[in-house]
Design a protein with these regions (language model features):
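Helix-to-loop junction immediately C-terminal to a conserved catalytic motif
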Residues: 50, 338
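Conserved ABC ATPase "signature" region
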Residues: 116-134, 399-417
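Conserved ABC transporter NBD signature motif
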Residues: 58-70, 346-354, 363
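The feature captures the beta-strand-to-loop junction immediately N-terminal to the Walker
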Residues: 35-37, 323-325
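Conserved ABC ATPase "signature" C-loop
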Residues: 220, 499-500
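Catalytic Walker B motif of ABC-type/P-loop ATPase nucleotide-binding domains
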Residues: 163-166, 446-449
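Conserved ABC ATPase signature
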Residues: 138-142, 146, 421-425
Length: 557
């Protein structure tokens, strides 16, 4: 079905290949999970299969590709659209129509298929993803998870034998992620050939089987290729060394020497686990607030109220996590905090002063903001110029500019990309560039909207280390996130938003131990916390805490 031989590819003006002598065969009905570090070539491989690289992006390509009997290097992209459908990371960048129904029929209409066939395929696709009852809705009325399911429905309506999905849950909350993964599971069940690039490996365990396939890409080359059972039982340490996420159940089992490695929590023999754990002590800190919000309401111009009677305090010199489902109001609240949006009612106090009475330029000199979508803040044509831009605006002298830019390039592993256009970077690389553009300005407060989207394990852990370092040096950090493992590792304080209202403010441990609150807010606790809680240790929220606790008690030798 898919045959790739000696494939190498260079992006325009790139010296190093993004794909390096790739060879693989994928057979009909296979489910293939593609793992790899940020910028390793995962997305590039998918783009090679449908002809986007050769015909839309350009660059240099060598080797042979065959997809359902077609060569994407020589075939037109529109011809490849009958063989393979692609669902991208950001549904907003893929959806083109105003109406749900129009979006699903758009592709088949362009192929001039009979009307009866188009209607039949569209109805079937919408029912398959659970959106048939919303077929007359505007796309703008859908949640983030629904938009991604719509993108999958549009791909299904093309009736291609292969569906490729490039991090389809990157921007989704835990419940939205589960909904999309359930759709992907159903794609497996009806016999579609599915290629999935994904970082959220914990949630994936609900849909993959031991005989499914994993391909690991490292620096553009295939590093590992085998069944799920083979990879997780024999190569878990290799995956860690490559800087990739392991499912927490696999990570715990590997560290404790449990074989064979289970794939699901319900497969762990809880009574057989050593129970000499201890709950880690957490220092109760008393913070003084740097930002206070009092009785804030906010509505957009269409009259829809997004934030309702918000009152909160952002602790100084802390890492505060803002969590909630897609559409709960997190991004809107963050934009209010920096004065880019104005509340209908209420106050935002920065250092005790109403932020709306202050000069916005002066406020933004002290507050750095990293957008959810990095592309929204890029304004130049090279990575170097992007990092330097804010320094130029602030009239920083040339020597100091050069030093700071050099430090940022090194800090975020972007040294070899100085002349790349920001829009040609991978999702993870774009995210790291967006961090660099803000940190180079040395803000007093750093606000980050979904900072770990598209990040591999190595970069996520580095970011956690960096945020802790910045906090210890006096920076106040606010992060909006859907990643509960990330929250567990670095947050001092957590605020939960649900439908524009605050449901909870306090210690992350209290949140993870409140099952009713988690379910109401469409959140979930880390898998390792579930294991520890069954053993009665409710303060253990990370794999490191779980395993080090056993080691300290000399249970593991």
């Amino acid at each position: 079905m898919i045959s790739v031989k000696n494939l190498s590819y260079w992006y325009p003006d790139a010296e190093k290949p993004a794909l390096d002598n790739v060879n693989l065969e994928i057979f009909e009905g296979e489910f293939v999970l593609i793992l790899g570090a940020s910028g390793s070539g995962k997305s590039t491989l998918l783009y090679a299969l449908n002809g986007i690289l050769e015909h839309e992006i350009g660059g240099k390509i060598r080797g042979h590709i065959e997809v359902c009997g077609k060569n994407p290097i020589t075939s037109r992209v529109c011809d490849m659209a009958t063989a393979i459908s692609l669902v991208m990371q950001d549904p907003e960048a893929q959806l083109t129509q105003m109406n749900v129904w129009d979006e699903v029929v758009f592709g088949p209409e362009n192929l001039l298929r009979p009307v009866e066939e188009i209607v039949q395929q569209a109805e079937r696709a919408l029912k398959f993803v659970g959106l048939y009852d919303k077929r007359d809705c505007l796309v703008t009325e859908l949640s983030g998870g629904e938009k991604q399911r719509l993108a999958i429905a549009a791909a299904l309506a093309m009736n291609t034998p292969i569906i490729a999905l490039d991090e389809p849950t990157a921007h989704l909350d835990p419940m939205g992620t589960k909904d999309v993964f359930n759709v992907i599971k159903n794609l497996k069940n009806i016999g579609k050939t599915v290629l999935l690039v994904e970082h959220k490996v914990d949630d994936l365990l609900d849909i993959i089987e031991e005989d499914d396939r994993i391909i690991v890409i490292d620096n553009g080359a295939i590093a590992l290729d085998g069944t799920v059972h083979e990879i997780f039982n024999s190569h878990a340490r290799d995956i860690e060394r490559l800087g990739l996420h392991l499912p927490q159940v696999v990570e715990v089992s590997t560290r404790l020497g449990i074989h064979p490695v289970p794939l699901r929590m319900d497969q762990i023999n809880i009574p057989a686990l050593p129970v000499q754990l201890h709950n880690p002590e957490r220092e109760r800190k008393v913070y003084d607030p740097i930002i206070e919000v009092e009785n804030l309401d906010f509505s957009y111009e269409n009259g829809v109220q997004v934030l309702k009677n918000i009152s909160l305090k952002i602790p100084r010199n802390s890492i505060t996590a803002l969590v909630g489902h897609n559409g709960s109001g997190k991004s809107t609240l963050l934009l209010n905090l920096i004065g880019l949006l104005k509340p209908v009612r209420g106050k935002i106090l920065y250092e005790g002063k109403d932020i709306n009475s202050l000069n916005l330029k002066e406020v933004l000199r002290e507050i750095g903001y990293v957008f959810q979508y990095p592309e929204h803040q890029f304004v130049t044509k090279t990575v170097k110029d992007e990092i330097e831009y804010g320094l130029r605006v602030r009239n920083v002298n040339e020597l100091e500019r050069e030093k700071r830019v050099r430090d940022m390039l090194q800090m975020f592993g972007l040294e070899k990309m100085v002349n790349r256009h920001p829009f040609t970077l991978s999702m993870g690389e774009k995210r790291r560039l967006s961090f660099a553009t803000m940190l180079v300005l040395k803000p007093k407060i750093l606000i980050m909207d979904e900072p770990v989207v598209g990040q591999d394990r190595r970069n996520t852990e580095y970011l956690i280390w960096l945020l802790n370092k910045l906090r210890d040096e006096g920076t106040t950090i606010v992060v909006a996130t859907h990643d509960m493992n990330f929250l567990a590792k670095c947050a001092d304080y957590v605020i939960v938003l649900n439908r524009g209202e605050i449901m909870f403010q306090g210690d992350p441990i209290e949140l993870f131990n409140n099952r009713n609150l988690l379910e109401a807010a469409c959140l979930d606790d880390p898998p390792v916390h579930k294991i520890a809680s069954k053993l009665g240790y409710t303060k253990i929220v990370t794999v490191e805490q779980f395993c080090s606790s056993l080691i300290e008690k000399k249970v593991v030798r």
